[in-house]
């Protein structure tokens, strides 16, 4: 168990070094436990949330999270507009109905910077984040996706998909090219 914990901590440290635009999952053990408990009540797989959010734009990243005490599925999307320029949104998908609950425009700060980096990565991708996430879940029976974040390894686009099964967490790297 200690070895598994060490591997998870190292994975979090890799994410914190800046290779990816944002941390994919909560850092503390208590936060991970709380998120894992909340996921039990969410029937909607992350990869389905990516598909649902696609009506608002191209999905750039997705994560189940607890924000301000509320459990939610958040997906960043991007939509090209030749007249007004690119637009970025955070789509909150209702995990109990599988419908879009809310769409918020991302206009500045760290969220906009992260969305722009994610767009640059996904522009190099030959496959969608949803496909990569589904592949990671299929290859890891019994696990479900908690987050999917695009990043670059040099110039190669990839997705880091965080998976959970009970209290076991792992991060899978999936190529997007």
Which residue stretches match the model-derived regions?
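Long, terminal "pre-/pro-" and other extracytoplasmic accessory regions
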Residues: 2-6, 18-177
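Bacterial N-terminal signal peptides
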Residues: 8-16
């Amino acid at each position: 168990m200690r070895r598994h914990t060490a591997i998870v901590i190292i994975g979090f440290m890799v994410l914190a070094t800046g290779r990816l635009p944002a941390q994919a999952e909560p850092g503390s053990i208590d936060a991970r436990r709380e998120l894992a408990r909340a996921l039990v009540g969410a029937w909607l797989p992350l990869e389905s949330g990516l598909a649902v959010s696609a009506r608002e734009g191209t999905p750039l990243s997705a994560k189940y999270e607890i924000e301000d005490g509320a459990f939610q599925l958040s997906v960043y999307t991007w939509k090209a507009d030749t007249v007004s320029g690119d637009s970025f949104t955070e789509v909150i998908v209702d995990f109990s109905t599988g419908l879009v609950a809310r769409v918020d425009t991302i206009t500045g700060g760290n969220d906009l910077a992260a969305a722009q980096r994610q767009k640059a990565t996904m522009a190099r991708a030959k496959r969608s984040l949803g496909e990569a996430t589904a592949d990671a879940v299929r290859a890891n029976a019994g696990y479900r996706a908690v987050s999917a974040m695009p990043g670059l390894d040099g110039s190669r686009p990839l997705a880091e998909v965080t998976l959970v099964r009970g209290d076991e967490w792992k991060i899978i790297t999936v190529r997007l090219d």
